[in-house]
Regions:
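S-adenosyl-L-methionine/SAH cofactor-binding core of RNA-modifying enzymes
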Residues: 63-92, 123-166, 177
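N-terminal nucleotide/polyanion-binding subdomain common to many enzyme families
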Residues: 1-75, 259-274, 278-282, 303
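SAM-dependent methyltransferases
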Residues: 1, 127-133, 241-303
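Hydrophobic/aromatic beta-strand patches that form the interior of the parallel beta-sheet core
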Residues: 4-6, 34-36, 141-143, 166-167, ...
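Structured adenosyl-cofactor binding patch, chiefly the S-adenosyl-L-methionine
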Residues: 176-227
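Internal, active-site/partner-interface "lid" segment
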Residues: 200, 212-255
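Long, intrinsically disordered low-complexity tandem-repeat segments
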Residues: 87-90, 95-126, 130-131
């Protein structure tokens, strides 16, 4: 799978993607990850990616022009031809903006000394894009992270894991120009709270998706026993020693009876879900033995 991110802070991914399972997935060739800097698709000396909001208000809004240009470059990078670097503005001509310049916008200034370095960076970026995308057969499935999006869950992670190529476009500051959302195949939200940036949210989604890929956890069935894999919370886990500070490991786990262990784990998953996340049980199809066990828990609660 190819996973790409487009943001103003690509360095934020280094520690997460360079450690643990994310690193292993890349070393095994299961994952090809690349974080792109949105500034490589800007054309002013300050490499501006944001501006004041129309209508006034606090904060800065990410401009849609660099996002569209970057998206088009990434979509073109399918290994079917070379990619031209972003065009530099002519003398006295600024980068085009979808709805015109804001009052006081400095993006219309002519090319300043030193701007060639931005072009060189863009060329290198596009070279990286082309190399990574040689294994991509189609344009990326594009995801924005925003509060108005679909609530992310394990089912969503499984769906995304079936894609060949994912592109996460990450907001920052006050948000993203609404017109950029026309590029989205899907908008995802982690929950009803605010984060500093879309980079943080994308890391959570990427981790959840990558661990679903065959071979990442060491076996095809590696993720099947995790929480939410079958709609239930995971059963309690224990390791040595069998006794610690007077707390004992359940005897059934020491019995060697695999059938009894399996049933204990199933009942623990059911009970934990019943007590902590009963909403997950709504509409779930369960075998008769599971329903009888849940009924016994309900009866206990009424005593």
């Amino acid at each position: 799978m190819i996973i790409e991110t487009l943001s103003t802070f690509p360095d934020m991914y280094e520690s997460v993607m360079g450690a643990s399972m994310m690193r292993i997935a890349q070393e095994k060739g299961i994952l090809d990850f690349k974080a792109y800097d949105l500034r490589d698709w800007t054309h002013d000396r300050h490499r501006t990616t944001d501006d004041e909001p129309y209508g006034g208000g606090d904060g800065l809004v990410m401009k849609c022009a660099p996002i569209f240009e970057a998206y088009e470059s990434l979509c073109a990078a399918t290994g079917k031809g070379s990619i031209a670097a972003p065009a530099e503005p002519a003398q006295g001509e600024g980068a085009s903006d979808v709805a015109g310049q804001m009052p006081g916008d400095s993006s219309g200034a002519g090319q300043a000394p030193g701007e060639g370095s931005a072009s060189a960076a863009a060329e290198q970026t596009l070279s990286d894009v082309s190399a990574a995308a040689d294994r991509a057969a189609s344009k990326p499935y594009t995801i924005f992270l925003a509060p108005q999006g679909r609530r992310f869950d394990d089912a969503c992670a499984c769906e995304l894991a079936k894609q060949d190529r994912l592109l996460f476009i990450c907001g920052h500051y006050e948000g993203i120009d609404e017109r950029a959302y026309t590029l989205a195949d899907e908008v995802i939200s982690l929950g009803d709270y605010v984060l500093t940036s879309g980079e943080l949210a994308s890391m959570v989604v990427i981790d959840a998706v990558v661990r679903k890929l065959p071979g990442v956890l060491g076996a095809e069935t590696g993720a099947l026993g995790e929480s939410f894999a079958d709609g239930l919370l995971e059963y309690p886990q224990y390791t040595r020693p069998a006794t610690f500070n007077g707390m004992e490991v359940p005897a059934v786990l020491l019995s060697g009876n695999h059938g009894a262990v399996d049933r204990w784990r199933r009942e623990q998953s059911l009970e934990r879900t019943y007590r902590l996340r009963p909403d997950l049980l709504e509409g779930m199809e369960l075998p008769d033995a599971d329903r009888a066990f849940l009924q016994s828990l309900s009866t206990e609660g009424r005593r």
